[in-house]
Amino acid sequence: MTVTRLLLGSTLALTLGSCAMMAPTMSYTLAKQPAGGALSSSGMVDVKKDGMTVMTTARVMGLAPNTYYVAHYHLQGAASADPCSSGGAPIMNSALVGQSDATGMLTLTGSVAAADVMNATYFNIHTARDATGAPADAGVTCTGIKM
């Protein structure tokens, strides 16, 4: 009986421990930024912490067709209390690069070490100069986030 209780207790601890590792997916709504100009971008960013990794999926529509974009997390800047207007430093190892389709839709998916983005306060999508992902503007769409 003691062995059974020990095994059940160990199983319960492992089960609960694995639940603590995975947080629910948080969804954030992207908002158009001044650099977006004539674009009518809208979309969502889903952020999921899984142990020591943060997985990100961004789905955006209303972008320029067949154009490269780069997205990444940013730290809070000092220019404004609003994260997307704060001018914070980009966290470059969180960069996701992709090309919109012929209708202006874009999906970006990737992961980064959780420790690298734990202090991020916003997620910004920029037009990219080319497939290398060098930003060409201050950002066309953005959302504040909480890690």
Regions found by a protein language model. Give the residues of each.
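Bacterial N-terminal signal peptides that target proteins for export
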Residues: M1-L8
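Bacterial N-terminal signal peptides
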Residues: G9-S18
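N-terminal leader/targeting pre-sequences
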Residues: C19-M147
